[in-house]
């Protein structure tokens, strides 16, 4: 078992970045191997690490175990018993005077209930002693100790309530006393609440960052190169370059990956940086809970003191006036303190409905960057990179086939690849284009049914207020020719039709006419922000 783990650790150390290896793999330890049941148990030091390693590395470790023992191995992750150890109970209760008093407000281990338990044990002990000395003494002892037990229980309940207030607001994962102390005593260059033990875990737990999402594994192409460049600039100069940075684009295009990458970079560059990633829905929930519990002082103190706030999918603020008001104050405080704010949305800022004009103007005061659906070459690169991370050799022809048929977003591509890998493994077949077609049969059918050239023509005509018939006509005024070229471009991008087929559907035009339109619009899109925005709206409308 230990030989295997040394072998496994050595391989993972070569495959992962030093930060990933030290954070996730090094703290693990094999604790049991059952040869009869073919099960291997690996212990993690805490629940956070256990859940993350199980979701991210279990498949790779299981593959290594199978190769090592030449048989399938069920890899199970367990919590290290030492992590949950409590002080063993004494053989007999010690006298009350001999027992150390619990520290006021202590929340560590079982101390939360310790005072109440100690008082209850003492009450029983005193009552037994009192029987020998007379009923009156027993009654007096029991009355006194019951009062102590009630007081201890009340103290414990108050401590729990304070901790629940902090936890409910999704503030850093500290108990009430630690959280208050961290908010009071934090200084630049010092990690809040860090005591040197499990510091990396604490940083990630407090910041809510995903350490796997970095600039190194972000696939770059024309569709996202500007957004990536802006993100790197902000990570290098937080609070100075582009504040706020507003990234917008459809689902699964890499917005969340980029903002986590910024946070991870800053966490590495600046020891003790106060960083928080939060989804807009969670922020709304925090505002509601702060209102219910009258805890706005703690709420403001926490959010207003951050160095970097990463807020995802801000369109969820729509129509929520109290949340918008609190965020406006937080935004103003952060920018005034030269802290960085980064926001994502699925829509251009001015088109988010139900958002206060004050906030819209703040969003526009920094840099707004669109992330577009990935082009063909980028989709292929994403598939190849993802396959590599899964330790699978993917033929480039297969990657091109998938990339040609699935065009909308990265998440869809990764989901398709997982289906292909599962299908191939289940049927014991090599990944070929034929196997890929079988694995993605339902998905490809839906894709082909979703968007038609006719639908593109109608949607584009409606958008530019012309007649659908103008798409087929020979009319050449600019107000008709331009939308027609845009529709041809979209037909090439969003359907599987060939250039001659598209030309035929546009009034029998030659394929060279279609090619000219496609190249013209593609070139102008990269230079004209207004055209790029219009195309983005059309694409999102067509994709539903």
Swiss-Prot record:
Subcellular location: Cytoplasm
Domain IV, binds dsDNA as annotated region, ranges: 425-544
Ranges annotated as biased composition (Polar residues): 191-200
Gene Ontology process terms (BP): DNA replication initiation; regulation of DNA replication
Major place of residence: cytoplasm
Region annotated Domain II, chain positions: 71-207
Region (Disordered): 90-111, 180-203
Any GO CC annotation of this UniProt entry: cytoplasm
Binding residues for ATP: 252, 254-256
UniProt region (Domain III, AAA+ region), positions on chain: 208-424
PROSITE patterns given in the database record: DNAA (PS01008)
SMART domains: AAA, Bac_DnaA_C
Gene Ontology molecular function terms on file: ATP binding; ATP hydrolysis activity; DNA replication origin binding; lipid binding
UniProt keywords, alphabetically: ATP-binding, Cytoplasm, DNA replication, DNA-binding, Lipid-binding, Nucleotide-binding
Top-level division of the source organism's lineage: Bacteria
Segments of skewed composition (Low complexity): 90-105
Pfam families per UniProt: Bac_DnaA (PF00308), Bac_DnaA_C (PF08299), DnaA_N (PF11638)
The family this protein is said to belong to: Belongs to the DnaA family.
UniProt note: domains: Domain I is involved in oligomerization and binding regulators, domain II is flexibile and of varying length in different bacteria, domain III forms the AAA+ region, while domain IV binds dsDNA.
Protein function: Plays an essential role in the initiation and regulation of chromosomal replication. ATP-DnaA binds to the origin of replication (oriC) to initiate formation of the DNA replication initiation complex once per cell cycle. Binds the DnaA box (a 9 base pair repeat at the origin) and separates the double-stranded (ds)DNA. Forms a right-handed helical filament on oriC DNA; dsDNA binds to the exterior of the filament while single-stranded (ss)DNA is stabiized in the filament's interior.
Protein name: Chromosomal replication initiator protein DnaA
Annotated source species: Paraburkholderia xenovorans (strain LB400)
Lineage: Bacteria, Pseudomonadati, Pseudomonadota, Betaproteobacteria, Burkholderiales
The gene coding this protein: dnaA
């Amino acid at each position: 078992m230990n030989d295997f783990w040394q072998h496994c650790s050595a391989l993972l150390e070569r495959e992962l970045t030093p930060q990933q290896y030290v954070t996730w793999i090094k703290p693990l330890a094999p604790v049991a191997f059952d040869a009869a049941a073919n099960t291997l148990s690996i212990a993690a030091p805490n629940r956070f690490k256990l859940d993350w390693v199980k979701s991210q590395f279990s498949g790779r470790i299981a593959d290594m175990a199978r190769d090592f023992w030449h048989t399938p191995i069920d890899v199970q992750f367990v919590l290290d018993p030492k992590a949950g150890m409590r002080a063993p109970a004494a053989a007999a209760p010690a006298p009350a005077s001999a027992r150390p008093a619990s520290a006021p407000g202590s929340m560590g281990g079982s101390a939360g209930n310790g005072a109440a338990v100690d008082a209850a044990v003492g009450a029983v002990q005193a009552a037994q002693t009192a029987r020998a000395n007379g009923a009156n003494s027993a009654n007096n002892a029991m009355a006194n100790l019951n009062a102590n037990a009630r007081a201890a229980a009340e103290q414990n309940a108050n401590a729990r309530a304070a901790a629940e207030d902090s936890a409910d607001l999704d503030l850093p994962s500290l108990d009430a006393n630690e959280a208050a102390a961290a908010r009071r005593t934090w200084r630049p260059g010092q990690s809040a609440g860090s005591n040197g033990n499990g510091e990396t875990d604490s940083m990630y737990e407090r910041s809510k960052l995903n350490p796997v999402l970095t600039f190194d594994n972000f696939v770059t192409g024309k569709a996202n190169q500007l957004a990536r460049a802006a993100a790197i600039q902000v990570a290098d100069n937080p609070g100075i370059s582009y504040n706020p940075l507003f990234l917008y684009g459809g689902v699964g295009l890499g917005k969340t990956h980029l903002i986590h990458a910024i946070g991870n970079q800053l966490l590495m560059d600046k020891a003790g940086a106060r960083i928080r990633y939060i989804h807009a829905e969670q922020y709304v929930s925090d505002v509601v809970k702060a209102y219910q519990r009258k805890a706005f002082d703690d709420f403001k103190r926490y959010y207003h003191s951050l160095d970097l706030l990463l807020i995802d999918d801000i369109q969820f603020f729509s129509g929520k006036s109290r949340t918008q008001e609190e965020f406006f104050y937080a935004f103003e405080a952060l920018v005034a303190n030269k802290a960085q704010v980064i926001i994502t949305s699925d829509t251009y800022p001015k088109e988010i409905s139900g958002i206060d004009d004050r906030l819209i103007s703040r969003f526009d005061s920094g840099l707004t960057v669109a992330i577009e659906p990935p082009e063909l070459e980028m989709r292929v690169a994403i598939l190849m990179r993802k396959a590599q991370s899964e330790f699978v050799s993917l033929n480039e022809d297969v990657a091109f086939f998938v990339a040609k048929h699935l065009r909308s977003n990265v998440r869809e591509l990764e989901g398709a690849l997982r289906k292909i890998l599962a299908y191939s493994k289940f049927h014991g077949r090599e990944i070929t284009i034929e196997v890929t077609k079988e694995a993605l049969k339902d998905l490809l059918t839906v894709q082909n049914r979703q968007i038609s050239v006719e639908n593109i023509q109608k949607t584009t005509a409606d958008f530019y207020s012309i007649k659908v018939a103008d798409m087929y006509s020979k009319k050449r005024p600019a107000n008709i020719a331009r939308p027609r070229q845009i529709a041809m471009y979209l037909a090439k991008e969003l359907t599987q039709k060939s250039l001659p087929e598209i030309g035929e559907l546009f009034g029998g035009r030659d394929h060279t006419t279609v090619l000219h339109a496609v190249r013209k619009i593609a070139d102008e899109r990269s230079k004209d922000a207004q055209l790029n925005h219009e195309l983005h709206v059309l694409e999102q409308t067509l994709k539903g």
